[in-house]
Design a protein with these regions (language model features):
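Structural detector for short beta-strands of small beta-barrel domains
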Residues: 1-10
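A mature extracytoplasmic/lumenal domain signature
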Residues: 18-20, 46, 58
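Flexible glycine-rich surface loops and low-complexity tracts that mediate binding to linear polymers
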Residues: 5, 37-53
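Short aromatic-glycine-enriched beta-strand elements
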Residues: 10-16
């Protein structure tokens, strides 16, 4: 999975609001607090319904 969108933080963790519409709940090993509310690129794999195990999060 390789997607771009806006990184959002909520009470349950992090979400990616996709540029193409919809959102994914992200499972992250590192907490990218410097990228919250910014446009990012997420790489990883689908772990279930709308859940992504993120290998990396970087500015888009």
């Amino acid at each position: 999975m390789d997607e771009t969108g806006r990184l959002i933080r909520d009470a349950a963790g992090f979400l990616l609001q996709r540029d193409l519409g919809g959102s994914y709940r992200l499972v992250l090993l590192r907490v990218p607090v410097d990228l919250v509310e910014k446009r990012v690129r997420v790489r990883g794999y689908h772990a279930g319904d709308n859940v992504v195990e993120a290998d990396g999060v970087a500015p888009a």
